[in-house]
Amino acid sequence: MQKHYTVAWFLYSAPGVDPSPPCRSLGWKRKREWSDESEEEPEKELAPEPEETWVVETLCGLKMKLKQQRVSPILLEHHKDFNSQLAPGVDPSPPHRSFCWKRKMEWWDKSEESEEEPRKVLAPEPEEIWVAEMLCGLKMKLKRRRVSLVLPEHHEAFNRLLEDPVIKRFLAWDKDLRVSDKYLLAMVIAYFSRAGFPSWQYQRLHFFLALYLANDMEEDDEDSKQNIFHFLYGKNRSRIPLLRKRRFQLYRSMNPRARKNRSHIPLVRKRRFQLRRCMNPRARKNRSQIVLFQKRRFHFFCSMSCRAWVSPEELEEIQAYDPEHWVWARDRARLS
C-alpha cells in the first residue's frame, strides 16, 4: 500500500504535470475568478423598501378623506445602471418583444408625466338638496327639501272636477269655508299626485275622498265633515244619525232592571217602533254607501303610501302654479 501511494505522489509532483484532474480544471478556474471579483466589489447596501404615502382626496368642512398612494420601487439609479450596461448599437430586448417593450416604455413615460401633474379631485355625486331653515348663533338647522310630484295633469283633473254640478253646489254651500278652504283644496291636488292614478280616472268620488281625508288631517269638526255625505248620497242620509240615536236609546232601555220592571215595556215597544220606522230601505241603502265610502277612503289612503301630511311649502307651491285661480280666494282670514 505504501508503494502505490508513493507512485501516485510522484506522478502528480512531476514537472509539467497539472495536479488537478482534467475534468475539473475549467470549472475550478471559473470558480476562482468569480470569487476574486466578488471580493473586489464592495458590498452594496440594500435599498430601503418604499413607504406608504397618503394624499388628500376630498376636503369637506373640518373632515378630510385620505387616500393611500403607492410609490413605485423603481428609481432613476436603476435606469442609469441598465443603460450603462447596454452595448452601443445592440437592442437588449429579443426581436419578438421589441414592440411590447416600446409600448411599455411609452406607458412609463406617460405615467411619469401624469405623476408630475396635480391630481384632480373627483366630482362628487349629486346629493339631496338641503336648505338652511334656521341660523342661531353658531348652530344652523338644516332641512331636507323634497321635490314636489304635482304635475300639470293633476291641476287639469282638479279643474275638470270643479265643473261638476254636485261639487259646485257643495262649494257654494260651504260659505264659512269650514270644509273647503284653499289649503284643504290644495291638499286634494297633492293627494291626486300621490295616489298615482291617471288624470282621466279621477271622478267626483275621488274629490270627496281626498277632501274627507284632508279634513281628517287638519280639522276636528266632525259635524261639518259629515255634510259631505249629504251632497254625495242625497238627503236620505240624514236618517242615519237618527237611526244610531234610536238604537242607542233602545239598548239603554233594555237593561236588566227594565226587563224586571213591567212599567218600561211600553217604552221599549215605542223605541222598537221608532227604530223600524227609521230603518227604511233608503236609509239602509245610504248606510251601506257610507260604509263603502269609508272602505274606499282607506284604499285611497293606502294608494298614497299612507302619506297624508302635506307641508306648507308644498301647498304654497301648488297655489303658485296658477295664483289667479278663483279657488285660492277661499281664505278664512278674509272672512274675519
From Swiss-Prot:
The keyword Lyase is assigned to this record: no
GO MF annotations in UniProt: protein kinase binding
Ranges where the record places region Disordered: 16-50
Biased composition regions of type Acidic residues, renumbered to the chain: 36-50
Keywords noted in UniProt: Williams-Beuren syndrome
Keyword hit for Ligase: no
Entry's family note: Belongs to the Speedy/Ringo family.
Known disease link: SPDYE1 is located in the Williams-Beuren syndrome (WBS) critical region. WBS results from a hemizygous deletion of several genes on chromosome 7q11.23, thought to arise as a consequence of unequal crossing over between highly homologous low-copy repeat sequences flanking the deleted region.
The name this protein goes by in its record: Speedy protein E1
Native species: Homo sapiens
Gene that produces this protein: SPDYE1
